[in-house]
Amino acid sequence: MEKIKEFCDTISNELGHGYKENIYVQAMCIHLRNENYLFRTEVIVPIIYKEIQLGYERADIVIYHPFKCILEFKAQNQALSNKEKIQLSKYKKNLNIDNGILINFNNNNNKLEYIEF
């Protein structure tokens, strides 16, 4: 997953900060395609209660090969908080994927935040 960090650093350095989240997702997709990763964007994450689907959320990117991992992007003005970590934890549980990465292209201080768990 070190390669994902490298992609994030490249995007941060070359594209910069201040764009909406979907711009960074698209930039990451360019890197993933160029490296022949198997992935999908906007993956449906079902919310199940007592075997009934109540609704769904969407994970930004799910990588299936060469490893399984959920990438969740943010472009917010504040640092990542427990709220975002909880969101990614739910996605990991509901999609049965062990690895996840939170990526924040912080618009306030032009700093990249990268949390792998």
Briefly describe each language-model feature range.
Residues 20-68, 109-117:
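Active-site metal-binding core of divalent-cation-utilizing nuclease and nuclease-like domains
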Residues 73-117:
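Nucleic-acid nuclease catalytic cores
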Residues 9, 44, 76:
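Histidine- and/or cysteine-centered catalytic micro-motif in compact active-site loops
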Residues 15, 54, 66, 98, ...:
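Generic secretory/membrane-interface signal
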Residues 1-36, 98-99:
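Solvent-exposed, charged helical/coil patches
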Residues 16, 59-77, 91:
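Conserved catalytic cores of phosphodiester-cleaving nucleases, focusing on short active-site segments
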